[in-house]
């Protein structure tokens, strides 16, 4: 007698049913990450400096949160709900090298990510979970090769150095509670990097 085949079961993915927060979610990489995480069954939260888009689509974040550089502490309650935080925001002043360009780039590209990283790490210490929390930090190709914009390069290299420094000084318990992933991508065309 023939036996019925078992029903196909959806494959479980590493990020299925996990909550992923992405800064810079409306940029080229942020959109691509959002699509990938959604396809693997994750809930995606976009963190934006802009007014959040109205309505939803099947490819964007499930919800949006507004935030501002310098006001990272206001995100603590939201950060505590995340399993993975992807720090992917930034600006490129192109050829601008004024004091304002330098200050703005350092603040947005390096210091705001550094503060968010510290806050998320502190949350991971108080919020031990079955699976470790993760933080992904996009430092940019400017960390490993010259960028067209010197100010962009300096600010992204600073972030990369801070992430490396912090990663090297964590104890084994901290490493088990929070995984730090440093993303150093090759150049790709985007609004931030139109070349």
Feature-to-residue mapping (PLM):
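Short alpha-helical oligomerization interface
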Residues: 95-109
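Amphipathic alpha-helical dimer-interface segment in Rossmann-like NAD(P)H-dependent oxidoreductases
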Residues: 108-130
């Amino acid at each position: 007698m023939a036996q019925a085949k078992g029903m196909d079961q959806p494959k479980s993915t590493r990020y299925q049913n996990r909550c992923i927060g992405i800064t810079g979610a409306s940029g080229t990489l942020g959109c691509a990450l959002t699509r990938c995480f959604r396809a693997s069954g994750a809930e995606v939260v976009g963190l934006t400096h802009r007014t959040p888009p109205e309505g939803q689509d099947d490819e964007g974040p499930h919800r949006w949160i507004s935030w501002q550089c310098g006001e990272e502490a206001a995100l603590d309650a939201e950060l505590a709900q995340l399993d993975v935080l992807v720090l992917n925001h930034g600006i490129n002043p192109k050829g601008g090298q004024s004091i304002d360009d330098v200050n703005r780039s350092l603040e947005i590209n390096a210091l705001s990510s550094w503060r968010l990283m510290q806050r998320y790490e502190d949350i991971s210490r108080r919020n031990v979970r079955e699976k470790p929390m993760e933080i992904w930090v996009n430092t940019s190709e400017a960390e490993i090769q010259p960028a067209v914009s010197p100010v962009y390069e300096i600010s992204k290299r600073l972030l990369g150095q801070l992430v490396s420094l912090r990663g090297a000084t964590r104890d084994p318990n901290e490493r088990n509670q929070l995984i730090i992933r440093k993303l150093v991508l090759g150049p790709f065309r985007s609004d931030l990097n139109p070349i």
